[in-house]
A protein has these predicted regions:
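Long, contiguous, secondary-structure-rich segments that constitute the structural scaffold
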Residues: 604-673, 803-820, 824-920
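Flexible loop/turn segments at secondary-structure boundaries
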Residues: 23, 45, 131-135, 160-163, ...
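Extended redox/cofactor-interaction regions of prokaryotic respiratory oxidoreductases
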Residues: 138-209, 214-220, 245, 323-332, ...
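Flexible glycine/proline-rich, aromatic-decorated loop/lid segments
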Residues: 227, 565-603
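N-terminal leader/propeptide and maturation segments of large enzyme subunits in energy/redox metabolism
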Residues: 77-97, 101-102, 110-115, 252, ...
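Glycine-rich phosphate/diphosphate-binding loops that line cofactor/substrate pockets in enzymes
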Residues: 95-122, 179-188, 351, 374-401, ...
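N-terminal export/assembly segments and adjacent metallocofactor-ligating motifs
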Residues: 1-326, 367, 462-474, 736, ...
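Thiamine diphosphate
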Residues: 2, 13, 114, 145, ...
């Protein structure tokens, strides 16, 4: 067959950042103006951790661009009634009409005051997966900055059901919004549910493959054999939600069955709170004058403040102390005369002694011999005393790490898990040292692009922390947002990301019903709600109830790609030009999420590879128009000049590419200025590159020292200690929060307050789910199985479920066609592979095909991704189940940080019919 040769073929460099495993570099092949292929960008092979490769999701972007189900013009709702069974009656309108509608609503809202009568913002916004929508929303963050207070309380699950507790405790302990292994140098990794071969993108897959070739060992501890488990040296099928017991037993082996000098004694003594003396009231013994914590000086045989010059602190022991004080909640000072002072390390050893492998075996269903062997392998691999040289600096080499996955590091039990994981690193000196357990980035602290700069001296020799106030004068008795993050969760702070990481389920739940004795203002709805790249009607819990709440919102504006289950309730759909059709610059490199540890840092351009389909518009163009029509143009431009577009300020000490605050600026003018400013800053004034340069080259980076991967050298340079093992500050803060709540007759958060402890204790974590069943009026014996959710590389963030190519590829990976179930358990229920089954919790049911496997515990079911769609084209026809449909939103199952977990007790039964190809 004769074909006409193309008139033009281009390869356009851009990036994919559709999930937190990005950014990945790629090129788009464009033939005669049509995108035909996505390819790796091998020009980035030397600077990108995945050598210029992208993951499977990026290959669906061509089909996403030309999806016949796309919304191609603004749409207005004509049916005033909202609900799943109400046809919205969307009709196409012009951009002028759409933008005027939004602008008038915003101006009316602003005229009433940006805060409503209860003191919370009238404008709310919800964005999806892990901050990644910001990589596609152009200058919209600058508009939000210009507006003022925004309520981000209404989450879509990406906070509280993500790796939530790790975010909060990780940043508190070692500036680690997320935590990863230093895979490039690690020899032994214990992974508790961290499914990095699915959720870590090509960067993690590449690095772990290289590590296996190098000979490292990964032990995967989880109830089912995930993709990561299948790629590991060993799979340990642990009982769901018993991970703290397993890790406590590992610590027992190290602390009780080995000698103290087999640990990293210098690290424990000099970089942690281990030598601090604890008094009989469980608080630090302090110098009566300076109030600094005391240590026992082995050189002078007396207690002295921890920072005394030339001090030689005792790591362990008990000592007679006189003339000290302790400081409790609300600055209550107690005199401590003739008391015993015990080092925090000795308190730890005594605390952990009861948690033997034999004790843990009965709880987590892992043989004691296996627990003991894994602990001993970990200690041997730690190579305590070894060093390595990085950029001329000699550092400890501790090639062991412990990493946690979703539902291990969030919800009840997560505090204990995060503490134990971090302590396992501390004991061998592997925290923030080469080969060990590392933090990736910061979001609750600033600056976001360099976690080292967030390390500043604070009280008691630790890093400065920015907790929400719990003292009587400053505690936020009146919530500043609908999820009450500032009122209930001190550790989350009050920076830009804090609200989205508060207990967002409370914002949804309290719209329906407040807890008994809440003694809080009646929750209000926002006047306007913006949503983008988020679908809480599918991605949160108890979704059928959530839909009813969404339907009550008075005015919802959705930046929309297709109709979905959330924007089905919207009043206005604004179609943005998507991934391959619009322009934006972002930061790349440094250290960022998952395993994105780079040896470079810089910026990358997402550019218009093809013309926008229909009447869709660049997000920056939409934002410009909103700013102009709402009278916020000057404030908006000033926000862009400050760097609110997400890269660099447009004016610095030696450069000025500022926009005229009073003028209107086309998207390409804005991004040209950003390109120039970013390259000037990165090159320290040596180069200034414009938008046209980036359209050709795609990215610009400069080398970065690998020393920036590791926080311990920064801690040492500033003479700071990690706030481990003893959690005295959290204990005091928790007591202070209890005082405030009880003064205001609020007892409904008491169970969460129980989590504030100096040394975490095991409590019956799985039993909390049984208790919740009983309290809901159900019988525990009726729901004998655990249902878990697991990540899928093909559907990592869930935003691409409407792309047929993803379905086609996913069918090659087991589990993407239904509910993974143990084959012997299935036989007991008379269920064969491919049978249609009902999975029911005490609040509802979800349906799908049985996918039988041996690599899953008999008491466990697993569903990949999040489905059960009923509005989104293509996805609604997949007949796929979802845990979210049947997992309750529950105050009872919310921990002290405000998080829950993707886990629910269920029953299962066979339905009529067989679903062909279910095992694919």
């Amino acid at each position: 067959m004769q074909t006409t040769p193309p008139k033009s073929v281009k390869h356009v460099p851009t990036y994919c950042y559709n999930c937190v495993s990005g950014p990945d570099f790629m090129t788009v092949k464009v033939v005669d103006g049509v995108a035909t292929e996505v390819e790796p960008n091998f020009a980035a092979a030397e600077i990108h951790p995945a050598r210029g490769k992208v993951c499977v999701k990026a290959y669906g972007l061509v089909q996403k661009t030309y999806n016949p189900n796309r919304i191609l013009s603004p749409m207005r709702r004509t049916n005033p009634k909202k609900g799943r069974n109400e046809d919205p009656g969307f009709v196409a309108i012009s951009w002028d009409e759409a933008l005027d509608l939004v602008a008038e609503k915003l101006k009316t809202t602003r005229a009433k005051g940006v805060l409503d009568e209860s003191g919370v913002p009238r404008l709310a916004a919800s964005f999806g997966h892990g901050g990644t929508p910001a990589m596609y929303m152009g200058t919209f963050p600058a508009f939000l900055s210009a507006w003022g207070p925004i309520d981000y309380s209404f989450g879509s699950g990406q906070g509280v059901k993500c790796v939530h507790s790790e975010h909060l405790y990780g940043e508190f302990w070692h500036r680690a919004f997320t935590v990863a292994a230093d895979t490039t140098s690690a020899c032994y990794v214990i992974s508790l549910g961290a499914n990095v071969e699915s959720s870590g993108g090509p960067c993690a897959v590449t690095r772990h493959a290289d590590a296996r070739i190098r000979g490292y060992k990964r032990v995967q501890v989880e109830p089912h054999l995930s993709v990561t488990g299948a790629c590991s040296a060993e799979w340990v099928p642990i009982r769901p939600k018993t991970d703290p017991a397993f890790m406590f037993a590992l610590m027992h082996v190290l602390l009780i069955e080995h000698k103290q000098d087999e640990m990293d004694v210098p690290f424990l003594r000099d970089r942690t709170s281990s030598p601090y003396l604890v008094g009989p009231d469980g608080l630090y013994l302090r110098d009566a004058t300076s109030r600094k914590p005391l240590v026992w000086d082995t050189a002078t045989n007396k207690a002295v403040p921890f920072d005394t010059a030339g001090v030689a602190p005792a790591l362990s022991g008990k000592f007679a102390i006189s003339g000290a004080v302790s400081v409790d909640a609300d600055d209550e000072v107690r005199e401590m005369n003739d008391v015993e002072g015990v080092t925090a390390f000795t308190k730890l050893v005594e605390h952990i002694e009861k948690y033997s492998p034999e004790w843990a075996e009965k709880i987590c269903d892992v043989p004691a011999a296996n627990i003991r062997r894994i602990a001993n392998e970990y200690l041997a691999a730690a190579s305590i005393g070894a060093t390595t040289v990085i950029d001329g600096v000699t550092l400890p080499l501790r090639p062991v790490a412990v990493i946690l996955g979703k539902s291990v590091n969030n919800g009840w039990g997560a505090f204990e898990c995060c503490w134990a994981r971090t302590m396992l690193a501390v004991l061998v000196g592997a925290l923030e040292n080469p080969g060990g357990t590392l933090g990736t980035t910061v979001r609750l602290n600033r600056p976001h692009d360099n976690r080292h700069k967030s390390v500043l001296p604070g009280e008691d020799g630790f890093m400065a922390q920015k907790f929400n106030a719990t003292d009587k004068a400053n505690w936020a008795v009146k919530p500043t947002g609908r999820n009450m993050h500032k009122t209930l969760v001190p550790i989350v702070g009050n920076t830009a990301w804090s609200q989205a990481l508060g207990p967002t389920q409370l914002a949804w739940m309290f719209q329906r019903e407040q807890p008994a004795g809440s003694n809080m203002p009646q929750p209000t709805l926002p006047d306007v709600w913006f949503i983008y790249r988020t679908n809480p009607a599918i991605s949160f819990w108890e979704t059928q109830t959530l839909v009813k709440t969404i339907a009550t919102f008075p005015f919802t504006v959705a930046f929309a790609y297709t109709v979905d289950e959330t924007n089905y309730m919207a009043d206005l759909l604004l179609p943005e030009a998507t991934d391959l059709e619009s322009v934006q610059m972002i930061r790349v490199g440094g250290t960022k999420f998952m395993e994105q540890f780079w040896d470079h840092k810089g910026v990358a351009l997402r550019q218009q590879a093809v013309a926008a389909q229909g009447d869709t518009r660049d997000f920056t163009w939409i934002t410009n128009e909103l700013a102009k029509r709402t009278g916020l143009l000057e404030q908006y431009n000033e926000a862009i000049n400050r760097g609110a577009a997400g890269v660099s300020p447009l004016k610095g000490a030696n450069y000025d590419f500022s926009l005229d605050p009073k003028g209107e600026h086309a998207p390409e003018v804005v991004w040209d200025a950003v390109c120039r400013a970013a390259t000037t800053v990165l090159s320290e004034g040596k180069e200034t590159l414009d938008l046209s340069w980036f359209k050709e080259h795609g990215f610009y980076t400069v080398p970065m020292s690998r020393l920036e991967w590791y926080l311990s050298p920064t801690m040492e340079k500033q003479g700071l200690r990690y706030e481990l093992p003893y959690q005295e500050r959290l204990l005091r803060v928790g007591r202070e929060l209890r005082n405030r709540l009880h003064e205001n007759k609020m007892a409904w958060w008491d169970e969460q307050l129980s989590e504030y402890a100096a040394l975490p204790e095991w409590h019956d974590v799985p039993g909390r789910w049984d208790a919740a069943l009983v309290n809901a009026g159900a019988k525990v014996e009726d729901f004998p199985l655990w249902l878990l959710a697991s990540k899928s590389m093909q559907y990592h963030a869930g935003g691409n479920v409407g792309i047929e190519l993803m379905r086609e590829v996913a069918q090659n990976i087991r589990g993407h066609s239904g509910v993974i179930m143990n084959a012997k358990t299935a036989a007991r229920y008379g269920i064969a592979d491919g049978d249609r089954i009902e999975v029911r919790s005490h609040i509802g049911a979800t349906y799908g095909a049985a996918v039988l496997a041996q690599g899953i515990r008999p008491d466990t079911l697993v569903i990949l991704g999040q489905f059960d769609h009923w509005a989104q084209p293509f996805a609604k026809d997949l007949d796929m189940p979802s845990l979210n449909t049947i997992a309750p939103m529950s105050l009872e199952l919310t921990d002290a940080t405000g998080s829950g977990a993707d886990i629910v007790k269920v029953q299962v039964r066979k339905m009529e019919g067989h679903m062909e190809g279910a095992q694919a």
